[in-house]
Amino acid sequence: MSHRRPASGTDGLGMSGVDRLVGEGARTVGAGAVWAVGDAGGTLGGGSHGLLGQGPYARLRPGPDTLHDLASLTKIVALWPCAGVLWQSGRLPPDEPLGRWWPPAAGHPAGEVTVRQLLAHTAGMLPYTRFEQLYGRDLAAIRAGVLAAPLHRPPGTAVEYTDRAAVLLTYLVEDLAGAPLDELAARWVWEPLGMADTRYGPLGTVLAARTAPTEYDERTGAHLRGVVHDPSARLLGGVSGNAGAFSTARDLARFLTALLAPPPGLPWGGAWIDESLREQTGGLVPARGLSWLCAPGTDPAEGTFVHYGFTGTGFWISRRLGRWALLLTNKVHYDRGVAQLTELRNAFRQAVFG
């Protein structure tokens, strides 16, 4: 990635300091890392460190064109903007319980929750998936199970992050739009922004060859590479709102730039971004926007938002500062420990946003 111009206000570090921070952090975490920082004009700077993986992957280094399993960043890159298209066109009422206007939810516990609560993770849904264990492998049975599952707590009483909210919202978005989420995301998000490498898996041989591997899979006897790591998304065929998308730092830079400077005619720009990037949880903690999390270590009033992915991915946005940042690692390839990665993420956020 080219350093287009120096960024101001990076806590005195500058781009070379941010690069050193990520390099040292990647060695401590023990994973490859790709980072970038930008503004409404595009990428300001970036870099990459470490190796793509162990064994046969130890000869490979990550870069801005390395595909990463985005894990829960899929919620932002695919599901959230598609929900925004429907919201801005008046087809997705944010505050009416689903059961009043979406027939599949009527008479079920899921009918008690609202779209806003699903996006803010205040819907009170079960905090785990366990789809195969609870419902088997049939997709219709899983959908029925998600709709009929009892709520974990009353809607609107607590913030509790759960993939079930994204899965339920996927069903709703697909029903309203009349197409699967991968087609909607490509049509409304990735193609308009020129995100040519972003897609759902499983990836073909050529793309898989430049994809960061995730965990070793006992069933196949190999590391997952180009196949979604998240077991729920894999069970759902690889396409879900909670996980399943793959992308590169180069493409994510285009996406984050568009949040600060939406292109004319973007069907989820403007009002949807305004609505989403403000606190939506009414003083409950942790504070969240719509899909986005208020960045840990910051005051929600500062308006710095983040989303993380289980595989080791993450990105941040601050409209107040006019800046975005991304940090992609393949941490889960090595182990599931999060303490050192959390330290790196927090230090990176502080360096870029203060």
What are these regions (language model features)?
Residues 68-71, 159-161:
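Catalytic tyrosine of NAD(P)H-dependent dehydrogenase/reductases that use a Tyr as the general acid/base
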Residues 93-108:
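Short, glycine/proline-biased beta-turn/loop segments that scaffold the active-site neighborhood
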Residues 117-119, 324-327:
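Structural recognition of the beta-strand scaffold that forms the well-ordered cores
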Residues 332-354:
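Generic C-terminus detector
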